[in-house]
């Protein structure tokens, strides 16, 4: 009985602390604080090794892109891209910038809609985000999708 009570206390304490994820001195990237900043048709990516939720959200038209870098949700500007996401295996490389922040993203298509399925508007991918801010750098591997 005593072991069960101690275990319950440890689980409750650990569970409470694990609900708050933020960048640490060793890590630049954390889950977005506002997980609903962008709704509808969008880019999204998650990295369970970083924490629960999205690490990247972007408007489908690239008018707004967000990552939590250094403990704050940062608006990123898309500055360049090349490649495509049309078929499985395709690669798209994109560069985003914000004040003092550089993000190089490399997306690789893992799934596309079946041919002839006009109601499907999603492409799934793996992505590697190489993030730098000042002298700090971090690479985050994530999975995500783009579409409606």
Task: State each model region's role.
Residues 15-17:
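N-terminal signal peptide c-region/cleavage motif recognized by signal peptidases
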Residues 3, 19-22:
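Long, low-complexity, intrinsically disordered N-terminal extensions of eukaryotic proteins, enriched
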Residues 1-8:
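Bacterial N-terminal signal peptides that target proteins for export
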Residues 9-10, 20:
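Cleavable N-terminal signal peptides
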């Amino acid at each position: 009985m005593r072991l069960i009570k101690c275990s319950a206390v440890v689980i409750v304490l650990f569970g409470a602390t694990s609900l708050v994820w933020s960048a640490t001195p060793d890590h630049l990237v954390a889950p977005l604080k506002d997980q609903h900043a962008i709704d509808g048709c969008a880019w999204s990516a998650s990295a369970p090794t970083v924490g629960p939720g999205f690490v990247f959200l972007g408007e489908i038209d690239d008018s707004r892109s967000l990552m939590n870098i250094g403990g704050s949700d940062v608006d990123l500007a898309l500055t360049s891209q090349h490649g495509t996401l049309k078929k499985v295996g395709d690669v798209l490389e994109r560069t985003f910038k914000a004040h003092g922040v550089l993000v190089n993203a490399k997306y690789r298509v893992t799934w596309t809609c079946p041919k002839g399925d006009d109601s499907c508007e999603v492409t799934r991918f793996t992505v590697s985000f190489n993030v730098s801010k000042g002298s700090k750098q971090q690479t985050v591997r994530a999975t995500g999708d783009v579409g409606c």
